[in-house]
UniProtKB/Swiss-Prot annotation:
Annotated ATP binding sites: G106, S107, V108, G109, K110, T111, S112
Keyword Plastid: no
Pfam families: Mur_ligase (PF01225), Mur_ligase_C (PF02875), Mur_ligase_M (PF08245)
InterPro entries (alphabetical): Mur-like_cat_sf, Mur_ligase_C, Mur_ligase_C_dom_sf, Mur_ligase_cen, Mur_ligase_N, MurCDEF_CellWall_CoF430Synth, MurE/MurF_N, UDP-N-AcMur_synth
SUPFAM superfamilies: MurD-like peptide ligases, catalytic domain (SSF53623), MurD-like peptide ligases, peptide-binding domain (SSF53244), MurE/MurF N-terminal domain (SSF63418)
Recorded superkingdom: Bacteria
GO biological process: cell division; cell wall organization; peptidoglycan biosynthetic process; regulation of cell shape
Enzyme class: ligase
GO cellular component: cytoplasm
Name used for this protein in its record: UDP-N-acetylmuramoyl-tripeptide--D-alanyl-D-alanine ligase
Length: 449
């Protein structure tokens, strides 16, 4: 159990007379499982309207901030403010935890890096990893409040699209190890330059103690900028990974072997060779930082590296699925210029006679949008696409630059594509689906499956 009457009473500073034993904390009644604690938050919707639904799904306790009329009154915990109660629960967990806390941020690859580190550590330790990509302030509170007391390693991804957001998160999280996975042109709608994004990401190192460890990508354009910020913060315990000769860790060999890939890593003066089921090169690059953390923690890196074979690509994040007669690379969870180029490189690597790209526009790029979309054209051509379907306003710039020898079509939205292209998966093809989440390219897969 994650919470009981005693620990909840201490965390909330109130007397709880009812017997309470709960697992995870949920604020969305749709996510409630048997044994969970439901907290009624007020936002665009009032969580108090969903209390009975949460109880019907198995919630053993419900935190509310106003009187409600339900049958299971013994499950109600009344507080002055539900959100403040959640904050108190999160702070209680952090202050009383003996776990080592690891925080990961970056423009792309946060979730896959976090999940990979979790898989490598959980063979020998009790590991908690924040759920999905729930990486904002509310997500941090819910995740911390759902962490078991016996956790040995806690891994959190931290997201942001404005200055000051990560600073607010680390004031609570206080990570012992913090990594910036990469800096790229994401969220440029809210920033004027990559340097500004780097400054915002470097907030992850605020509140560092003397022995805390910073891990950065030496391949970043902003590498020297980040080093300067770390120097100003008086942080000296720094490790790096990437392609740079300065890096403590790097991927030095990536060789495809049919359905497998052979990888060689250099990690802190050690060479690691592994052969695992095929993964795209950008995933292999991300795992460099993961292996570096494993080595810093003093774990057996050769044994841990073998567990990379246990990592499976997921739907929406690069997994290949079959629809009718086609193989489909489902990479529509999100998109930035860097991840879009990486996905097209992935498409290039996978052998197929006929290749099709369905490219959704990349959102939140601000005044750089036209240029960053146009820069994808050579990657599309290099991937060997015979058909290209473009979805969303800014992909019109790609359409205009693609040569006429390629079969190309532009659609204002995904619904228009689904309506007009009725034979999408009928032929034996390899199809990449990639775009920002807001374009909703997942509807294509849902419609045809």
């Amino acid at each position: 159990m994650i919470w009981n009457s005693k620990t909840l009473s201490i965390a909330l500073g109130i007397e709880i007379s009812n017997s309470v034993n709960c697992n995870e904390v949920q604020f969305n009644s749709k996510d409630v499982k048997k044994g969970d604690l439901f907290i009624a938050l007020q936002g665009n919707r009032d969580g108090h309207d969903y209390i009975q639904d949460a109880i019907d799904k198995g919630a053993t306790a419900v935190i509310v901030s106003k009187q409600v009329e339900i049958n299971d009154k013994d499950k109600i915990i009344l507080v002055n403010n539900s959100f403040e109660a959640l904050q108190k629960m999160a702070l209680y967990k952090r202050e009383n935890s003996k776990a080592k806390f690891i925080a990961i941020t970056g423009s792309v690859g946060k979730t896959s890096t976090k999940e990979a580190l979790k898989i490598l550590l959980q063979h020998d330790f009790i590991v908690f990893a924040s759920r999905g990509n729930f990486n904002n302030y509310l997500g941090l509170l819910i995740n911390l409040a759902s962490m078991a007391d016996d956790t040995e390693y806690a891994i959190f991804e931290l997201g942001m699209n404005h200055q000051g957001e990560i600073s607010e998160l680390v004031q609570i999280l206080k990570p012992n190890i913090a990594m910036i996975n990469n800096i790229s042109e994401a969220h440029l709608e809210f920033f004027h330059s990559l340097e500004e994004i780097a400054e915002a990401k470097c907030e992850i190192f605020k509140n560092f103690s003397k022995n805390d460890i910073a891990i950065i990508n030496a391949s970043n354009n902003c590498y020297n900028k980040i080093l300067s910020i770390l120097k100003n913060l008086s942080i000296t315990n720094i490790y790096s990974f990437g392609h740079s000769s300065k890096a403590s860790a790097k991927l030095i060999l990536y060789k495809t072997l049919g359905e497998q890939v052979h990888l060689q890593y250099y990690i802190n003066n050690k060479f690691i060779d592994i052969t695992i089921p095929f993964i795209p090169r950008h995933f292999a690059n991300n795992y460099t930082g993961v292996l570096l953390i494993i080595d810093i923690l003093g774990k057996d890196i050769e044994i841990s590296a073998k567990y990379l074979a246990d990592i499976a690509l997921t739907k929406g994040r690069g997994k290949i699925i079959n629809i009718q007669n086609s193989r489909v690379i489902c990479d529509y969870y999100n998109a930035s210029p860097q991840s879009m180029k990486a996905a097209l490189e992935y498409l290039k690597q996978v052998p197929a006679d006929n290749k099709t790209s369905i490219i959704g526009e990349m959102l939140e790029l601000g005044w750089n949008s036209q240029r960053l979309h146009e820069e994808l054209v050579p990657y599309i051509l290099d991937a060997g696409c015979t058909k290209v379907y473009l979805v969303g306003a800014y992909t019109k710039y790609i359409y205009d630059l693609l040569p006429n020898k390629i079969s190309k079509k532009f659609f204002k939205n995904v619904e228009e594509l689904i309506t007009h292209i009725t034979d999408l998966f009928e032929y034996s093809e390899l199809i990449l689906i990639k775009g920002s989440r807001g374009v909703k390219l997942d509807k294509i897969v849902d419609y045809y499956q």
